[in-house]
């Protein structure tokens, strides 16, 4: 004769004669529901879906239990003594409901025209070591270049957007088609400030032909710093927003990140002659004094402390919200 197991998380039928210490897999704890998350107090797994919660496999082995838990009794309470007795009758496995704290009042959005402050740059040991190696190699390259001013066949043009390479003296007479502006990344769209042909695809952006004509630049001496696009993303926790820029061997002495409560300006020089710029109107408000920048050999992380513990819908404030904010401030 099979019996129904009443252990939480089991619910299977079992044969009492074959019931052993590891026959049942169940939850010895109680259900916990907090901030839309559901789980058991005895294990760490959490889910927002109630069906998933019901299907969470037990975390403890033991005997099947055929004893049905007592139903909660609801007598007509008339005295304090009876209320106390009623509390004792309630099953011990009743779910725990944790009340969330009251929401904080929304902070009034400060003006974007507040003075900008340079965030503290924290340079890692790995970046310092990488820069020391690059310094030695660049010194050796400069000596070689001084010995020979000859341009090697296959040398790419240093102008942004130009894909031509040096094939001989006739290459210097060719017209160079390049982008004279800077790359701009805004609300998922990518374009150059000089021609503003917008696209959401990064490869299409890189393949856009230049909108300006001029002469090719073959050597670093003539090119100087070159503004280039750079992969970057962001993530957040309850109290912090982090922007990651994937630029190798950034130069701390030539780079800076400045911010006020609602604006972020990023200027990174990396790999010797490359530059990355990004200006962001932040979706939320940050605490500038508690924000900083971590610089490593492979990336830069801008850690911004939130002024209020709210989840941001995006990193950047949409244009419509910005205009609405300005209109409200004018009124």
Curated annotation (Swiss-Prot):
Transmembrane segments: none annotated. Zn(2+) 3 binds at residues 157, 162, 176, 216. The keyword Secreted does not apply. Zn(2+) 2 binds at residues 27, 42-43, 59. Keywords: Metal-binding, Repeat, Zinc. It holds the Pfam family CHORD. One of its GO terms (molecular function) is ATP binding. It comes from the Eukaryota. Residues 5-64, 157-216 form the CHORD domain. Zn(2+) 1 binds at residues 5, 10, 24, 64. Residues 227-316 form the CS domain. Zn(2+) 4 binds at residues 179, 194-195, 211. One of its GO terms (biological process) is chaperone-mediated protein folding. Regulates centrosome duplication. PANTHER family: CYSTEINE AND HISTIDINE-RICH DOMAIN-CONTAINING PROTEIN 1. This is Cysteine and histidine-rich domain-containing protein 1. The lineage of its organism: Eukaryota, Metazoa, Chordata, Craniata, Vertebrata. The gene is CHORDC1.
